[in-house]
Amino acid sequence: MLPAHKHTLETLLADTVKQVALASQGASEAAFVSPTITLERPKVAAHGDVACNVAMQLAKPLRANPRQLAQQIVDALLAQPGARDLVEAAEVAGPGFINLRLTAAAKQAVIAAVFAEKERFGRSQRDAGKHVLIEFVSANPTGPLHVGHGRQAALGDALSNVLASQGWDVHREFYYNDAGVQIQTLALSTQARARGLAPGDEGWPASAYNGEYIADIAKDYLNGATVAASDGEPVTGARDVEDLEAIRRFAVAYLRREQDMDLQAFGVKFDQYYLESSLYKEGRVEKTVAALIAAGKTYEQEGALWLRTTDDGDDKDRVMRKTDGTYTYFVPDVAYHVAKWERGFTKVINIQGSDHHGTIARVRAGLQGLGIGIPKGYPDYILHKMVTVMRNGEEVKISKRAGSYVTVRDLIEWSGGATPGSEVDVDLIDEETIRRGRDAVRFFLISRKADTEFVFDIDLALKQNDENPVHYVQYAHARICSVIAECKARYNMDESTLADVDVTPLTSERAMALLNKLAEFPDMLQHAADELAPHAVAFYLRDLAGEFHSFYNDKAERVLVDDAAERNARVALLAATRQVLANGLATIGVSAPVKM
């Protein structure tokens, strides 16, 4: 149901319920408390288009039989001026549900709405004026992005688009963990490669990174190459094998550039990159620790500084500063979230792997301990589970590029049709391969709820049939493009006139099912935004593509028919479907191809 129709029906029902309730209890209008009118789609299509349980809500306070009350509401509703424009039939079901069937005209109205709003169909300004920071990916600059980062990138970018579709001002942020032990390990690994060592050689660091990318960094460092991340200053290799700090700076810049390339191939952009090292340079970490000490939220024990996280729901207190004077990893996270708050982001969503679950209570406890007005439950978290990559029925655990894990770029290239084992730079692979791979990876990685484990099947991603969900959806769009092109050629049809076509011939069961699904798009986007559930978009697109294919494959619904009225109405329906498919695909960062 279109949002405008939903609002009208809610108003009609509210007025009707008030009328029936006042007549039933003889109370004054001033004393009447209106119940919440909730409209839902019945689980069984045969039960109608809209269901409402308001009679069951009111039965007890009105001391009425819910079925009898529901019938009174139905009778009064159908007598309301304008109700028959929307409601074709109404009936009472079960213990007192009110099931409504919409008129054909109400369902057909979605076509005009789509033509009028085009790429904005489904969008609203409901949440205009609200600001949200979404932090996602946030990888250590110690190697290429792995498939877990890819799931974060797909989820974060799609969620950003979903929230923006409802008017949110979305700030996308990537937090670089460019300080700490792992960065030191990166520097030592690169230094070892620069000295000519390889994994397994005598003198190779015990915890070093073994991927071939480390050898590439060392080679460029020794050659005096210049590298820079998209937001960073250029860094030139100093060629000095003994200068560990110069090696560290070069290696971090090199890998930040590599991660930029991964994100570019994935079609994901950020508004800001925030460096962990800046928290130390600006004194934010020390300031945060000092504030917690001053607030009485810490204590010394066995030479370490502890935070009283149990005061705010953690299962035990946590060490903040170790005996060697260094901070545990959650301390800069607390300082970082103070910075988010001070920048005015009262709504923050972090998308992280489920292995970060233990840090949530610690970060929130630290923020509460500061007593600076940050609400409990800040920030929000979306935790995703792991991704397993399968090919030829077997799990793929390593790649040449990373050495110990499958990278995002591997996944994009393989899903686009590149030969496994022939990994090369993105700019050396044809654009169509990257597009196909990006589309498959992005669609697949948001096609399940974040809190479920995901098996990414490379063989399935390469299939060009209905088993492949992204192909199934994209083919629906391309198929419609082909039909409309054929209509233009065969009947000299002017596509710009479709908005004025008479769509009243669209009365069949298949047509109505497709119209209903189109009208669900705005509500689906609002629900996805409210529930922070971008997977809902992928679910919807599969369902919409299914309704289209069912309609188009029905011989009774042939589009290329001699009857101009029927043909034009069906073409208008297809054109509206094409637009909604394109809108949904754009929301999750997937292309809508014209031909396949």
Curated annotation (Swiss-Prot):
Domain of life: Bacteria
InterPro entries: aa-tRNA-synth_I_CS, Arg-tRNA-ligase, Arg-tRNA-synth_N, Arg-tRNA-synth_N_sf, ArgRS_core, DALR_anticod-bd, Rossmann-like_a/b/a_fold, tRNAsynth_Ia_anticodon-bd
Keywords: Aminoacyl-tRNA synthetase, ATP-binding, Cytoplasm, Ligase, Nucleotide-binding, Protein biosynthesis
GO biological process: arginyl-tRNA aminoacylation
Keyword 4Fe-4S attributed: no
Catalytic activity from the UniProt record: tRNA(Arg) + L-arginine + ATP = L-arginyl-tRNA(Arg) + AMP + diphosphate
Segments carrying motif 'HIGH' region: 139-149
GO molecular function, one term: arginine-tRNA ligase activity
Keyword ATP-binding: yes
Subcellular location: Cytoplasm
GO cellular component assignments: cytoplasm
Enzyme Commission identifier(s): 6.1.1.19
Family note: Belongs to the class-I aminoacyl-tRNA synthetase family.
Quaternary structure and interacting proteins, as annotated: Monomer.
UniProt name for this protein: Arginine--tRNA ligase
Species of the source: Paraburkholderia xenovorans (strain LB400)
Species lineage: Bacteria, Pseudomonadati, Pseudomonadota, Betaproteobacteria, Burkholderiales
